[in-house]
Amino acid sequence: MIVVSVEASYRRVARTALREGTPATGERAVPEEVPVAFSYGGSTHAVMMASPADLIDFAVGFSLTEGIISMRSEIQAIEVVEAGQGYDVQVDLTDAEADALRARRRHMAGPVGCGLCGIESIEQAVRVVPDLSSVKSSVHGNDIVAAVKALNDAQTLNRETRAVHGAGFYNPREGLLAVREDVGRHNALDKLAGAVVNAGISAQMGIVAVTSRLSVEMVQKTAILGCPVLAAISAPTALAIETADRAGITLVALVRGEDFEIFTRADRIIL
């Protein structure tokens, strides 16, 4: 079963366009962007600007990739509450994880509201991630091409707006199993991670495909999800390549049509 977001998070606005030198009035679909807060134990941990869709998946994926939980069962409940112009996503953790997060907060220098949440030092920004070197997984080159194409075809929000990022999980045997979209590339990947975990999909036997460049955080989040192959339409950063190499992740970038470039663990790709 394909797990696809069907929540529309865009509006139509008036605009004036210039077409071949001639102005014309009309409408354009633009994505919504609202503040989304994640609260644990009644305290706000982070605030992101995000698309207001798939917030349960977002909460699970964010909690996982930021190291707040290590498995889905460590979240007892999630409630999404409207708060002014945005949403407060209230996450109820098990006692052990709640205690660990409180201890982590006591050492934080100040409030956080960005991609690297709860980070106290430069060393933590380049954090240790799971080593997937031993994961026995291989895919064909045409699977990489198919994964990116399937993601592009399934991006309903981007088709309307041409303004959002997408992240998808592709299994060579079953096709595209999950796709999530957001105005932020990190958010899209967190939402995908949550969708995969909530659906009970094994991340080890597939490909994470994204429509953005490959920064180090995208590699870190993919490693924590447990997927050994990450593919993108844009180029990677040097640190992303180094991190993927250490984590045993096959990093494929610049996927355009049937062309792509492999930067790490090329042995997993059957050409």
Swiss-Prot record:
<dbReference type="InterPro" id="IPR016193">
    <property type="entry name" value="Cytidine_deaminase-like"/>
</dbReference>
<feature type="active site" description="Cysteine persulfide intermediate">
    <location>
        <position position="114"/>
    </location>
</feature>
<dbReference type="GO" id="GO:0016783">
    <property type="term" value="F:sulfurtransferase activity"/>
</dbReference>
<comment type="similarity">
    <text>Belongs to the FdhD family.</text>
</comment>
<keyword id="KW-0963">Cytoplasm</keyword>
<dbReference type="Pfam" id="PF02634">
    <property type="entry name" value="FdhD-NarQ"/>
</dbReference>
<dbReference type="GO" id="GO:0005737">
    <property type="term" value="C:cytoplasm"/>
</dbReference>
<dbReference type="InterPro" id="IPR003786">
    <property type="entry name" value="FdhD"/>
</dbReference>
<comment type="function">
    <text>Required for formate dehydrogenase (FDH) activity. Acts as a sulfur carrier protein that transfers sulfur from IscS to the molybdenum cofactor prior to its insertion into FDH.</text>
</comment>
<protein>
    <recommendedName>
        <fullName>Sulfur carrier protein FdhD</fullName>
    </recommendedName>
</protein>
<dbReference type="GO" id="GO:0006777">
    <property type="term" value="P:Mo-molybdopterin cofactor biosynthetic process"/>
</dbReference>
<dbReference type="GO" id="GO:0097163">
    <property type="term" value="F:sulfur carrier activity"/>
</dbReference>
<keyword id="KW-0501">Molybdenum cofactor biosynthesis</keyword>
